[in-house]
Structure formats: structure tokens, C-alpha cells
Amino acid sequence: MPAVLDTPVAVRRTAMDLLARREHGRVELTRKLRQRGAPPELIDAALDRLVEEGLLSESRYLESFVSYRARSGYGPVRIREELGQRGLQRADIEQALRDCGIDWQEKLYELWQRKFAGALPVDARERAKQGRFLSYRGYPLEMIGRLLSGRGGDD
């Protein structure tokens, strides 16, 4: 039987349990607590206190998420979209992507090497296939175009 979240202590404990597993954004944590039946006024109070104590941080969440998704082979376009869907502010997302220190061209090249063994496309069909894959992964079209025309990557 799930725990009843009808007291501030229970809501805080559940929020801290979720944060112990991984970083969460405020919107995501609010959604999870509501799904568990916590009243909105208790959620807001608990999350405000966690922010004051430094236990809940949007910037840490953004940094963690960007780093994790980049290591998984996703590009800035895809990461930006996913964070937007999670209810984060556009300006904060852009700042996190600027501050992450990731060389997106290098990440694109590594992904392309891993998936296509560094073989430049020989015809339009193969070029479209590689381009679709890299675009789906969230890399900008201009970066993909440079790479597939032989002007990007290890230069």
C-alpha cells in the first residue's frame, strides 16, 4: 500500500527519496508528488523549503540532464526539446547548454563514427539515411551537412 502524503513530513520525505535517486526539476518533482496524492499546498511548501536548503536546484538538474543525455549520444536540439517538455524555462535551458562545456561537433563525429564506421555517404540515399539518424539524435542540420560533406569532424 502506498504511503499517504497528507502531512508536510510525509511529502518532504517522499520528495527527498526522489531526489536521493537523481536530480529533479521543480515541475517534475511536483508532478510526481501529485501522482502520489499529495495536496498542492503541501507540495509547494515542501519544495520551497528544499530550495532554501539547497537540496532542490534547477541548475544542478539542468547540468545533470544535459550531461547524461550528451553521454547517451543526443545533441543540443533534442536535449533542448526534452527539457522544454519537462517545463523548464527556455532561458535556463539555453544557459545550461552554453555552460556545459560540451563540444557538440566532436560528439556528433563520435556518434557518426560509432554508427556508420566513419564511412562518408556514397549516394543520396545513404546521405539521407545518415542525415535522418543524426537529425533524430538532435544535432543541428548545418553541423550534419558539414560532417557528411567531409568538412566536419576531426579537422
UniProtKB/Swiss-Prot annotation:
Keyword Iron: no
Gene3D superfamilies: Winged helix-like DNA-binding domain superfamily/Winged helix DNA-binding domain
Family matches, as InterPro entries: RecX_HTH_1st (IPR053926), RecX_HTH_2nd (IPR053924), RecX_HTH_3rd (IPR053925), Regulatory_RecX (IPR003783), WH-like_DNA-bd_sf (IPR036388)
Keywords: Cytoplasm
Entry GO CC: cytoplasm
Source species, domain of life: Bacteria
Main location: cytoplasm
A Gene Ontology BP annotation from the UniProt entry: regulation of DNA repair
Matches recorded under Pfam families: RecX_HTH1, RecX_HTH2, RecX_HTH3
This protein's record includes keyword Cytoplasm: yes
Cell location: Cytoplasm
Similarity comment text for this entry: Belongs to the RecX family.
NCBIfam families: PRK00117.2-1 (NF001054)
Function as written in the Swiss-Prot or TrEMBL entry: Modulates RecA activity.
Protein name: Regulatory protein RecX
